[in-house]
Every structure is written in C-alpha cells, then in structure tokens.
UniProtKB/Swiss-Prot annotation:
Protein name in UniProt: Protein LSM14 homolog A-B
Domain-related comment: The RGG repeats are required for interaction with ddx6/Xp54 and accumulation in ribonucleoprotein complexes.
Segments carrying motif TFG box: 381-401
Molecular function, one GO term: RNA binding
Described function: RNA-binding component of messenger ribonucleoprotein complexes (mRNPs), storage particles that mask maternal mRNAs from the translational apparatus during oocyte maturation. Acts as a repressor of mRNA translation. Probably involved in the storage of translationally inactive mRNAs in the cytoplasm in order to prevent their degradation.
Residue span, DFDF domain: 287-323
Residues annotated as domain Sm: 1-81
Length: 471
C-alpha cells in the first residue's frame, strides 16, 4: 500500500490478491465487517502482473462494489477529493441542484452522490440505520457520510474535510486486515475481492435507485431525485425507519394474518377441528363440505325395531359364511386336504352327532369322563378344516369387520398367535379365549380372533421349527 491519505470521495486504485486492479471513488469503509465500498468502479484486469489467471480489462463502470479488506493487496489514493462549493447557510433553502455537470464533477454537495440521483451525504447522515450499517473508524477518523445539520441543505467544505481519515494508508490496511470478514458477502465475485456488483449500467445513465446490499435495505426502495423540492417530515422518516427495522418475525406474522383474513370464516356450529388453515391444513378433514349434520328430531327406536327383521339378517349371515366356505383352501404345510379324508370325516362326524341327539343320550357322565360331550369336539381324532374354523369364529365372535381394521369383530386380540399352539384344546374349544390346558394333541390354534389366521400366515416360513414353545 503506497502513501497518501485517503478521503471519502477521493479516487482510489485498489489491487486485489487476484492481481486485478480497480479504480473508483471511495464511498465508505465498514470496520466492523472489514469491507471497503467503492462507487463508479472500473476493472482494469490483471494488466502485466504475474498471475495464473490473467483477466482482461472491462469497459463497464460498476455503480457500487464492496471489497473484503482481507483480500485487498494494495490500495492507493490517486486523487484527493476536489473542493466542493456550497451555498451560504440560508434557512430558506430547502434543496438545491446544479445540474448534471456538477453531479459528475462532485462540485455540489446537494447533488453529489455516487449513485447519481441518490440522496446527499447530509440526507444519509440523518438516518440512524446507515450509521449502524457503516460505522466509523476507531476514534474520530471517519464519520458517517457527513455531519448532521439542522437544515437538509448542502455541507460546507470544512464538514467534508472533517469527515475524512486521519490515519495513514498503511494503518488503514492494518485495520482492514484485522477486521472480521463478512460471510454473507461471499457470493457474486469474479475475483476474491468483489463482494457485490449491484449495478452494471454505464455511468452517464444511472438508475433512479440502487440497492446497496443485504445489510442496507433502506437504499433498495426508490429514493427521491434531486429535482424534488419537497422535504420529508421527521414523522414520515421515523415511520419508514420503523418499517425497515422491524424483524422478520413481525413480517411473517403480518403475512399469516393476511392469509387468515382471506380464509372463509367458519360458523360457530362447525366443529373446532376445522381450524388450522394457516398451519398446513391440520384438521381440515373434520369439516364437512355440506356443513354439519343436523337432525330434525330424536331417533325413534320403536320404528327402527319394527323395521328390524331377524330372518333377513340370519339369511345374510349364512350367505356370507357360504361364500367363504366355497372358496378353495390352500394346502397347509404342503399337505393336500383333498387326500387326507378330512371332508369325509367331517360328514361322518356330523352324522354321528345327529344320531346321538336323536337317541337322547346323556351329554355328561362323570363316571366316564370329567369333560362333557357338548362343549368339546375333541372326541373325534380329526383335524379341523378352515371352513369350520371360520364358522366357529363367526358364531363366537361375530362377522368380521373391514379388512383394514386392526382390532374389532372377531379379528381383535390374539392377532396372529395361532402358531403358538401346544398341547390342549385351545384352538378347537368353542369360545375358549386363551386356549391353554388340556391333554389331547392339537394344531394349537389359540382361539382368540386371529388364531387360525396366524397359523395360515406363517405356514410358509417354518416358524415352528425355530420357535418351539416349551411344554
């Protein structure tokens, strides 16, 4: 970094660590984020400096570029700021302009600004937000854009000179290198030092407004031109600053409130589960499209009982069982039921039961056995078919409900435990909930609702070989 004392508004020659040289007007220095802002910047490329990636010069004039201080290799003051003429301190003057020539040559403070029609330094200094974004160098070396005056007119030359650096250029580079780098400014750089190039338009035709960056939202809105003769009142400025400084949470709340106003208002008669439209529609399924169900009168149980026909229900019940019985059954554990003679045994067993009932034999004789012959069907050495198992389950627990219901009907508890049989009559006792105890051999259907299903589902996986239940 070569000698000279830099001033705000002076022409600066800056060389980055990528060996690219830039020239522009010193706009401000942020020691908190260790950044340097230049206005009216032009890139001269790498020129003759040795580098791995030579870059040619560019003809465009950037309105505003922010450089990271740690990536600046050299900084030279080419020209000090030119003397600026000002109008006398007349309270009658609200705002003045000298035309385009003065704006380009920085002769008038009132029309001066690196962004063309941007407000003057005195207008910037009245905003506390700018003072927060672009802080001063330690001590009184750099003030924020200019001294604050009672009238928003021009600044005398002494005010601008007083707002310059009082340290040497080498000290300035040391402060920039020691400052922390700003992580949100890593994007949009063709060399490591370019932080933001907001405007790429040419200098003679600057836009009416320019965005300074993410940290300065006050400059992103349209700003008044120098031809305007009306001054903003302090109340209006306070209101605008209040809107700018509001946190993001308040803006999100305003957005949610606006959405909630657009939602149709639910009546008080609708269920409360319809709330939550702004939270992803939680509970919207609880709201009926045609409104809540309304009943004109109480339910008439007598008329409903009169319409109840038990014969029709029994007929439907038997039809459902018949349809299920007619379905072909899969072989269990590789055995073919057609060859086992189970059907003939079942038919013979039913015939024997009818003969016993017709003869009027005593159903319970404790001299012969402790068990009776009514509730026990284990007096015949046969295997129970799936059709009989379904029929017994239906008679005991009722018809099954929908297939996707986990508990309810006869598909309630017991789920899939049929393969856990052992000894006893568990699967063949009517209405036996647990199915444990007993003496005779059994396939081990543990009653319950899904005992038979469990054995059928796990028939292909040889579950009994690996997980045997101890006797």
């Amino acid at each position: 970094m070569s000698g000279g004392t830099p001033y705000i508004g002076s022409k600066i020659s800056l060389i980055s660590k990528a060996e690219i040289r830039y020239e522009g007007i010193l706009y401000t220095i942020d020691t908190e984020n260790s950044t340097v802002a230049l206005a009216k910047v032009r890139s001269f490329g790498t020129e003759d400096r040795p580098t791995d990636r030579p870059i040619p010069p560019r003809d465009e004039v950037f309105e505003y570029i922010i450089f990271r201080g740690s990536d600046i290799k050299d900084l030279t003051v080419c020209e000090p700021p030119k003397p600026q003429c000002s109008l006398p301190q007349d309270p009658a003057i609200v705002q003045s302009s000298l035309g385009s020539s003065s704006a380009s040559s920085f002769q008038s403070v009132s029309s001066y600004g690196p962004f063309g029609r941007m407000p003057t330094y005195s207008q910037f200094s009245t905003s506390p937000l700018v003072g927060q974004q672009f802080g001063a160098v330690a001590g009184s070396s750099l003030t924020s854009f200019g001294a604050e005056t009672t009238s928003s007119t021009s600044l005398p030359p002494s005010s601008v000179v007083g707002s310059t650096f009082t340290q040497e250029a080498r000290t300035l580079k040391t402060q920039l290198s020691q400052g922390r780098s700003s992580s949100p400014l890593d994007s949009l750089r063709k060399s490591p030092t370019i932080e933001q190039a907001v405007q790429t338009a040419s200098a003679p035709h600057p836009p009416s407004s320019a965005a300074v960056g993410r940290r300065s939202p006050v400059l992103s809105r349209p700003l008044p031109s120098s031809s305007q003769k009306t001054a903003e009142s302090p109340e209006q400025r306070k209101g605008e600053l209040h809107k700018i400084q509001r946190p993001d949470t308040e803006q999100k709340n305003d957005y949610k409130n606006d959405l909630s106003r657009r939602q149709p208002v639910l009546s008080a008669a609708q269920p409360r589960r319809g709330r939550g439209g702004n939270r992803g529609g939680r509970g919207r399924f609880g709201v009926r499209r045609d409104g809540p169900m309304k009943f004109e009168k109480d339910f008439d149980f007598e008329s409903a009982n009169a319409q109840f026909n038990k014969e029709d229900i029994d007929r439907e019940f038997h039809n459902k069982l018949k349809l299920k019985d007619d379905k072909p059954e899969k072989p269990l554990n590789g055995e073919d039921k057609t060859d086992s003679g189970v059907d003939t045994q079942n038919s013979e067993g039913h015939a024997e039961e009818e003969d016993v009932l017709a003869a009027g034999v005593c159903y319970y004789d404790k001299t012969k056995s402790f068990f009776d012959s009514i509730s026990c069907d284990d007096n015949r050495d046969r295997r129970q078919t799936w059709a009989e198992e379904r029929r017994m389950n239906a008679e005991t627990f009722g018809l099954p409900l929908r297939s996707n219901r986990g508990r309810g009907g006869y598909r309630g508890r017991g789920g899939g435990m049929g393969f856990r049989g052992g000894r006893g009559r568990g699967g063949e006792r009517r209405g036996a909930p647990g199915g444990v105890g007993g003496f005779g051999p059994s396939r081990g259907y543990r009653g319950g609702s899904r005992g038979g299903r469990g054995g059928r589902e796990f028939a292909e996986y040889e579950y009994r070989k690996d997980n045997k239940v101890a006797a």
